[in-house]
């Protein structure tokens, strides 16, 4: 029979086990007769009685505690989750809050959380270091807390005016409540449930109640004043229980707080309360003094908890070990064996390798060992990010540059060291100074990987931030390292390696405009001083000479098509960038790249598209609008210029590829500082199309089958015509459309004002290196094409027109007008003749007028209508109908309507 079904306490059951009969619990009996016949575990769970207010407020305080912990560790995602739960818990407690008022601790957490989020939001550096989830949660939570706090605006304002007072009021209120409850217990000499309730952590369970120590009571004396009212004498309780043996008493009465009955007990309790109040007052008075001392003591220093300030260096070798080449190489191989394995600390591995270099240099083990370890350090830095799309951190990137520079210093200082990827590890010579030192490794591969890492850094940095500018400054170091490796490989490398490093040098040179060389071309040598000439000589060769030298070497020595193709495209791009149109065009035509570029890999195709665009812009600067239009036609007509130039992905095409393909294509994008301005590109294309299309439309206005030179230009014209209300142009496209309409009328001044104005200068024309020359060229082209359009449009109106009049109208000199009209007459575009003595253009009027053109069109349409009707009638009558019998099959002999075929046949017979 279980002991837990006995009546009385544990002590009773223990003492009377042998001598007395156990009282059994009747099956199916009335439980109301023995309401507290419970086991110890049931006692612990059922004796805690809490009000609804306590339950709701405890739930709120637990959530607030979790939020504050998350705030300490800057876990904004956790803060967001707990804040949403806090709002729901507050909604459940709404009925209690309406009666009691909004608790102060709730207002405090709302105010503190809002201040905390504002502080995080203003910390720009901290936001950059946040992960994606925390950054997203910060934005969401900041909006939610601002919206939520509007309902508590007055409470938060009162709290912020005196936050300390609010905190003290809460503490005092809690103390008064606890003291008031204890006083009531003393006066009433009664027992309430709240008088003996304790937290689970404070309530001992099982037999441990008998063995509570005095130290436990001393530790909890400051937390609650209820401890003094508990009966500390276990012997008295035991004796009481012995006296009550055999009675069915309530077990909870053993744990009820007893009211002090004697005067001594009352005095002791009163003294304890006074001591506690005094301690509290001392703490309050001591707090401002401590704050002043802290402020005077200097600035605070933020430290990471749990991390020792002085980090001990890892021990590489046991104490007393002799450091030799074999020991260091063995240790190096041990470190490298963990490379790439799961769970390997890559940062610690890099640190160990750096420490190994330091040990090797301190023990004078030779440069060969140091070079080998340096190669592995750089390789470990590249392997730090296993994900291909992840770019290097700034500190790792700087460490990589420094390490490569140190490696190059060693190689240049020790010509007897030979490095190469074809050297086997068994044939390495790291310490024998009598023979040349041989180390396995490829410096060219390291530099190519460094260049790729630099590209990834630029791709993943916000191009409109100062951080991008700071990273772009590192290109000078990258170019310097490439130049040093170039000099090293020119002495000791193979032809293939030299071609590869030359291509790297070309890729960092081809897109840069050489302003110094351009300035020297504008300034004649006689006009420059001697110091300027000396400075120009010291600066080295121009970029044009450098590109010529590097590319010619690749043309002659390279055996791979890819390197030669890239070199040709970069060379053409550089020529076009510096307005050497004919050299760039001839090189493109001689290379025949346009015939087989579709078989090249995507990065080379992107480079080809960039080169063609730059070639078209160069032709436009030279005034060759037709060549410019032809070069830009393929890129602009596709509507995917941004994607074809590697400057971004289109949203509509994102749905056509999966996530992996998107990542691959994003890695192909060129960095922002290599981008070509797409608005400038479109403007150049549309202006070129306007200068070609408007005169052509005027010359073939009556031709129903005229072809379109540029579909995109016609599309922009149709969009402009569909506008119900035309206002002044705002965008670049609207300016070009408005200029086209003016050119149709031969109004070159209005056309000029739409193409060249302050807004267009800022958007397009000022971006050219020689902006004034481009604007002058544009004005001249607009005047010439407007003259051609005017003659095509109004030739039917004039019998003759003076060239001087045309010269005055379009502000062109007379020889230019004469040249334009002569070309039009020679090409049979204008049916006229020049009268040299009078300097007039005599129109021949062979072309039909507009009214005659309309009449001819009407006649053709009527003729086709009659023929269609006759065919329909023949089909209805059948082959043996009366029509064919009466006409004697004349229609089938081409003697139908107007007998045109017969007349022409007869005319041709008489010609013979």
From Swiss-Prot:
GO CC terms, sorted: eukaryotic 43S preinitiation complex; eukaryotic 48S preinitiation complex; eukaryotic translation initiation factor 3 complex; eukaryotic translation initiation factor 3 complex, eIF3m
Modified residues (Phosphoserine): 9, 11, 13, 15-16, 18, 39, 166, 178, 181-182, 908
Segments for region (Disordered): 1-44, 157-305, 521-541, 884-912
Annotated InterPro entries: EIF3C (IPR027516), EIF3C_N_dom (IPR008905), PCI_dom (IPR000717), WH-like_DNA-bd_sf (IPR036388), WH_DNA-bd_sf (IPR036390)
PCI domain span: 672-848
Name the UniProt record assigns to this protein: Eukaryotic translation initiation factor 3 subunit C
Alphabetic keyword roster: Acetylation, Cytoplasm, Initiation factor, Phosphoprotein, Protein biosynthesis
Bias type Acidic residues, positions: 166-190, 216-229
Organism superkingdom: Eukaryota
Homology family: Belongs to the eIF-3 subunit C family.
Gene name tied to this protein: EIF3C
Annotated positions of the N6-acetyllysine modification: 99, 642
GO molecular function: RNA binding; translation initiation factor activity; translation initiation factor binding
UniProt-listed GO biological process terms: formation of cytoplasmic translation initiation complex; translational initiation
